[in-house]
Amino acid sequence: MADPGNRGGIHRPLSFTCSLLIVGMCCVSPFFCHSQTDLLALSQADPQCWESSSVLLLEMWKPRVSNTVSGFWDFMIYLKSSENLKHGALFWDLAQLFWDIYVDCVLSRNHGLGRRQLVGEEEKISAAQPQHTRSKQGTYSQLLRTSFLKKKELIEDLISMHVRRSGSSVIGKVNLEIKRK
C-alpha cells in the first residue's frame, strides 16, 4: 500500500501522462492538417472571383499598367522578382489589397450575398421575394458599394504614394521591362 505522505509517487505519473499527451498532440496534429485545403492553390481558387478581383485592381491602377489580367499578373510577377525594395513593397501592398478584394468576393458568393448574373432568373427571384427582404438587400448592397468605394480610394491613394515616392520613372521602367519580356 502506498504511503499517504509520499506525494511524489502520484505526481510523477501525472506529469509523465501530461508530457505524453503534449508530445502526442504535437506529433499527431500534422497528420490532421494535411486534410485542410490550401487557399493559395490556384486549383482551389474561385476563377470568377480571381478574374473579377484582378480586373477591379487593374481598373484602379493609374496610370494603367496593362489592358489585360494576364498582363497585370506579369507585372505583379516582375514586381515580386525585382530586387528593388520599392518594387517589393509595392508588390506586397497590391497583393494584400488583391487578397482583401478576393476574400470579400469569395465570402459574399459562398454566403449568397454576392450578385448573381442569372439572365431571366433575377426577375423571377425578385418578383417572388417579399418587399421587406428586397429593402434589406438594397441596404446591404449599398453597404457593399460604400465599402468598395472606400477600398478603391485607399488603393488609388496607396498607388499614388508609391508613384510619388519612387517617381513616375519606376512605372516607366517596369512597363519597359514587361514589354521586353
Curated annotation (Swiss-Prot):
It comes from the Eukaryota. It is found in: Secreted. The keyword Signal applies. Keywords: Amidation, Secreted, Signal. The modification Leucine amide is found at L113. One of its GO terms (cellular component) is extracellular region. Residues 114-181 form a propeptide. Residues 1-33 form the signal peptide. The active form requires C-terminal amidation and disulfide bond formation. Expressed in the pituitary, testis, and heart and at lower levels in the brain. May be capable of activating GPR83 via the GNAQ signaling pathway. This is Protein FAM237A.
